[in-house]
Amino acid sequence: GYPSQAQGMGGRQVRNGKDHGEIFDHHFVEFTYDSGAVIASQCRHQPGCMRRVDETLQGSQGCVNTKTGKLTDLEGNEIYKYKSDMLNEPNPYQVEHDKLFASIRNGGVIADAENGAKSTLTAIMGRMATYSGKVITWDQAMNSDMQIMPESLDWDSNPPTMPNSNGSYTIPTPGVTEF
């Protein structure tokens, strides 16, 4: 399933010049599911810092980190670690493409549009939460009139956010920015 709500924080500390548009350079989002499960997602785009883009699933008996492939108990003891054999395992991106191309050749259908759209909305909901500083529900994100796409998709289209006369962009401010 998909999260029922998101809350988070983020900001611009390093990438704050006119050449960086409106984007934050770090985000931390907690996605909460109807079951009560919470997934913590974080990213940072700051030169000279540890770069981290991953998700952590915290349960009542332990924790899973998607980047390390480790499952630990509540005391941090390793219960399981995915053992990768990088030399003999196929590249997952290549496997995905192989399946897609085989499906096309054989007249099959891989119907991932709904999953792709809902996964994208999940990411947008997280960004809405960090930019606004508010808890954003799935329904609020789904029904929002926020426009992040150009009005038309052609080579002459402008993005929905343009710089002002000084070349600066309006930067989202948590607690002020609406979604």
Task: Describe these PLM feature segments.
Residues 1-179:
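Contiguous beta-strand/loop segments that form the cofactor/metal-binding neighborhood of enzyme cores
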